[in-house]
């Protein structure tokens, strides 16, 4: 990896609050905050990036041990025009690894049997994952009436209405677990999967909408392959599922290196308030807190961190709905096995487990099948996910009990025989924001908070999508909005 602090042509501003250089505080050094700070610094803005913990990157962190690679959080992400631009600016193209095209199977468990998820209409007709009755229900989807009520609808209600309960249980439910670790009965269709909801509104049918999208894509009009459609980008090259040779932390390490001198680790922000048209940020540990006056503030923290921060009463009133965003706990358990101790070929992306199967795991990634350098040559790596909205108590279990429960599933589903030769357990007490029914109140609160507090900006995965690509785009977009504000403010 070749990263220099100013390799992208950054203007490196001098320290201090005075002079002609505009100053911005970015709070939270996850992907969104890092990208926002990077983009602002490229524009010549004097940036200070505050991070309460001892490391940057948020949920992205990579452990290397005994020839194994374990991701603490995201294992991969989908590229877009915005992502490709960032990778080029950071000179990371040579570090990128694309997912193995031969590992494109997604297995789903039904009746304790792993079945490839059908990815084409022909495969759907032939799959054993759905009954004949369920397949017929899917084929009749264009005849289902369009919903006329304008109220928010849960994912479960939407899918049952258009495709039937079996598709919900064995096609949609497991993917909800894979993306949100959530419950389709409580997640909002309009906010968790806005593009899919829009297909019904625009075309009256999901089937018709998908056919129209494919037709438009083949003519070069749009790119429908981006993640869930939370943040669209301009048409670009083929979307790719990628990681990096040395793991996902390569991205956040490169961003951190590119903004050298701006990052304050172990420096929690305690108070943000407006004073004489500017913003005062109080940050630091007990006894070492310092104030800094800046022209604008980007809050790139999770919603629950925002809730714990001191702020003036009027600001808290506007932000109140944001503080109620739910974050269920999730544990990731990366296990390494000798190849001969796993009967299954691991010839795919991984396996997802519907809630109806009543298993211990939400799903598992076949990490060493997906990307190289994830395990020694004679071993394999499997990354398992436990907990989420419907099994929160499982995520909180200690490592020994968690390994025991997970091994029970892996032995039955994958034919695992021996004990793991590597294990890495990471517990996330608040993992992924849940875009629940009524989530428009959260988005409205964020908009109102910004409107009532000029120079204050809210960003992060509770606003515009939970994927790494969404967070990259969110950081880029908030930096653009801040830069426009600074220009208008003179």
Residue spans for each PLM region:
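Mid-domain catalytic core of redox enzymes
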Residues: 2, 19-20, 43, 265-382, ...
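Conserved flavin/dinucleotide-binding core of flavoenzymes
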Residues: 2-13, 17, 118-122, 346-348, ...
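N-terminal Rossmann-like FAD-binding beta1-loop-alpha1 element of flavoenzymes
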Residues: 22-49
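Conserved Rossmann-like nucleotide-cofactor binding loop
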Residues: 32, 55, 304
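Glycine-rich FAD pyrophosphate-binding loop
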Residues: 41-65
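Dinucleotide-binding Rossmann-like beta1-alpha1 core, especially the glycine-rich loop
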Residues: 66-147
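Feature captures the FAD/FMN-dependent oxidoreductase FAD-binding
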Residues: 85-115, 163-169, 258-265, 270-279
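Active-site/ligand-binding neighborhood in enzyme catalytic cores
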Residues: 138-271, 293
